[in-house]
Regions:
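N-terminal helical cap/lid subdomain that shapes the substrate entry/recognition surface
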Residues: 2-95, 102, 113-119, 142
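Surface-exposed alpha-helical segments enriched in charged/polar residues
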Residues: 95-98, 161
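Short, structurally constrained coil/turn elements
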Residues: 32, 100-102, 133, 166
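Substrate-recognition "cap/lid" segment bordering the active-site pocket of phosphatases
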Residues: 114-168
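A structure-centric signal for secondary-structure junctions around beta-strands
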Residues: 3-4, 103, 137, 167
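Short beta-strand/turn micro-motifs composed of small residues
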Residues: 110
Length: 168
């Protein structure tokens, strides 16, 4: 058996704390009391997948969200509630990442969207004083940029083929 050379990490829950309940609570406070029925993580809704794969723009997302929720909220209200789930980048995890980087080729692959991306990059900069979280990795892959998301095998094959990795 060969030793491990490459590691593909996720972002949410690994390096960035995620609190889904905060987004749910924020939308309920804005009047969307059936948030779970419409938008839960386990409810199949193409709106989120389309946003996470870059098929729709931020502005289109806001409009479709309003239509789906059947309530008028401003773009800023939606953005603020949508980003409420984004937590901190615990510094001890970033220190651990630096140690791992010394021994392995590390990559990031995250299902995300441009709204969250912009917000968590600001969080990272505020917490660390540095402006590019992506520098921790040989390459960072975000679903909205590659048009593919987890858990679909094609998303992993995309990275494996682009980086000439051997999955084991």
């Amino acid at each position: 058996m060969q030793s491990i050379k490459n590691i593909i990490f996720d972002l949410g829950g690994i390096f960035l704390d995620i609190h889904y309940q905060l987004t749910k609570d924020a939308f309920i406070n804005l009047g969307i009391e059936n948030f779970d029925e419409l938008f839960s993580q386990h409810h199949a809704n193409n709106l989120f997948e389309d946003l996470e794969t870059g098929k729709i723009s931020e502005q289109t997302f806001y409009q479709l969200f309003r239509n789906e929720a059947n309530v008028y909220l401003s773009d800023e209200q939606i953005k603020t509630a949508w980003n409420a789930l984004l937590g901190r980048f615990p510094l001890e995890r970033l220190d651990w990442l630096k140690q791992i980087k010394e021994k392995y080729n590390i990559y990031l692959f995250s299902n995300t969207n441009q709204i969250h991306y912009d917000a968590f990059m600001k969080i990272y900069e505020t917490e660390t004083g540095k402006n590019d979280f992506n520098n921790h990795f040989l390459k960072a892959y975000y679903s909205q940029n590659i048009g593919l998301r987890k858990p679909y095998p094609a998303s992993f094959l995309y990275i494996i083929n682009e980086q000439n990795l051997v999955p084991e």
